[in-house]
């Protein structure tokens, strides 16, 4: 469990039985069956894999703790995201289905790619960008990312490293509510919302 930014943690998952992990395509997700204390039935949730499929020893998922609704602060925060961020301990065993999902990158195509994402929605795109950069495939990629500010800019350093390593990646970051320490041209390129 690694703290990223704000209420986001990345979880590095390894098989408890020592067997190889099933491969995945960049952009796919894991389905979790969670046994959360106080719940009468298991809770099923899906979270995107947020790292390259070229790391066969672990899966990484990055999960934001969902707060109560702004207009209903007396409501509880997100059940499964709170479980992951506040209760899950190292060496806990989770029930996970093999990677699945149809939102994945066709690594054989030569067509240009345009991604539009915001906040924690960056996770499947990050998996795809990392896989593309590691493979050396020379496809034009445009990524428009919307974030509130630098305090919530998830995986900023990894994105910047990918942008430096891949000359075909055109990263455009938009901060909707920049903070004093956020510098346009360094931390983000545009003010406002991605639209």
What are these regions (language model features)?
Residues 97-111:
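A short, basic/flexible loop-to-alpha-helix module at the beginning of a structural domain
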Residues 1-92, 147-149, 174-178:
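Ferredoxin-reductase
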Residues 56, 138, 164-166:
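Short, well-ordered coil/turn elements that cap or connect secondary structure elements
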Residues 49, 122-134:
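Histidine-anchored nucleotide/phosphate-binding helix
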Residues 60, 95, 114, 140-144, ...:
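A structural signal for isolated positions on well-ordered beta-strands in alpha/beta enzyme cores
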Residues 144-195:
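Reductase modules of NAD(P)H-dependent flavoproteins
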Residues 110, 131-141:
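Conserved S-adenosyl-L-methionine
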Residues 112-123:
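Short, glycine-rich nucleotide/cofactor-binding loops
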């Amino acid at each position: 469990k690694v703290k990223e930014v704000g209420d986001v943690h990345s979880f590095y998952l390894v098989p408890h039985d020592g067997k190889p992990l099933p491969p995945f395509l960049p952009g796919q997700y894991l389905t979790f069956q969670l046994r959360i204390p106080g719940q009468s039935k298991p809770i099923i949730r899906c979270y995107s894999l947020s790292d390259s499929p070229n790391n066969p020893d672990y899966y990484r998922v990055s999960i934001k703790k969902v707060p109560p609704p702004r207009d209903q602060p007396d409501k509880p925060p997100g059940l499964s995201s709170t479980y992951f961020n506040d209760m899950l301990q190292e060496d806990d065993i989770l029930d996970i289905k093999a990677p699945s999902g149809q939102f994945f990158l066709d690594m054989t195509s030569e067509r240009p790619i345009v991604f539009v994402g915001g906040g924690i929605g960056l996770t499947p795109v990050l998996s795809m960008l990392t896989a593309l950069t590691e493979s050396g495939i020379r496809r034009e990629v445009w990524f428009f990312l919307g974030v509130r500010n630098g305090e919530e800019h998830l995986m900023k350093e990894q994105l910047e490293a990918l942008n430096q390593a891949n000359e075909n990646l055109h990263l455009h970051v938009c901060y909707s509510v920049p903070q004093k320490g956020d510098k346009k041209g360094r931390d983000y390129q545009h003010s406002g919302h991605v639209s």
